[in-house]
């Protein structure tokens, strides 16, 4: 069972429909017990970083997400949800994030139109489970104005938009997609299937303990 975190700032319906399409079991929730009972977690997000962190704090979800990370449960952040995984952001004001990944969220400084919106090529930087079954250079759908300034060793895929934009990031059981898998057609469905596979593997490992 995958828990989609509902905190009022995500593409909940799009993610829900995508998981339904691939046949994944899921629940939309902000309940701590339900999140911790799940086998994997998706943190979606659309909007401003400071507001999102305020809402997560108000709903006591910051501690829950850190606990999810600590116990090794697979966690996938999408778009703003990915950005929230990092240590801090400069969006609107200096603001602390969840601190589950090293790095900071910064404004795109490019001559191109901002936000970076539309399809872009995703190039492989290193292997990790969410790449399974994907062709290097597949096109995915972006909508964002900020990017993750983070260590190279956690960047698994990049896109070019006047600069290299980390599209895929990962460290241990924590995964992030700056783009929207749920809006990226069959490529996105494969990515979500891959995450489902990671979740099932983690569930099996817990049953064998």
From Swiss-Prot:
Localization, per the record, is: Cytoplasm
Which reactions fall under this protein's catalytic activity? Answer: 5-[(5-phospho-1-deoxy-D-ribulos-1-ylimino)methylamino]-1-(5-phospho-beta-D-ribosyl)imidazole-4-carboxamide + L-glutamine = D-erythro-1-(imidazol-4-yl)glycerol 3-phosphate + 5-amino-1-(5-phospho-beta-D-ribosyl)imidazole-4-carboxamide + L-glutamate + H(+); L-glutamine + H2O = L-glutamate + NH4(+)
UniProt KW keywords: Amino-acid biosynthesis, Cytoplasm, Glutamine amidotransferase, Histidine biosynthesis, Hydrolase, Lyase
SUPFAM superfamilies cross-referenced by the UniProt entry: Class I glutamine amidotransferase-like
Q: Which PROSITE patterns match?
A: GATASE_TYPE_1 (PS51273)
Which Gene3D superfamilies did the record assign?
3.40.50.880
Question: What is the annotated quaternary arrangement, including any partners?
Answer: Heterodimer of HisH and HisF.
Q: What does this protein do?
A: IGPS catalyzes the conversion of PRFAR and glutamine to IGP, AICAR and glutamate. The HisH subunit catalyzes the hydrolysis of glutamine to glutamate and ammonia as part of the synthesis of IGP and AICAR. The resulting ammonia molecule is channeled to the active site of HisF.
This protein's name: Imidazole glycerol phosphate synthase subunit HisH
Gene this chain is encoded by: hisH
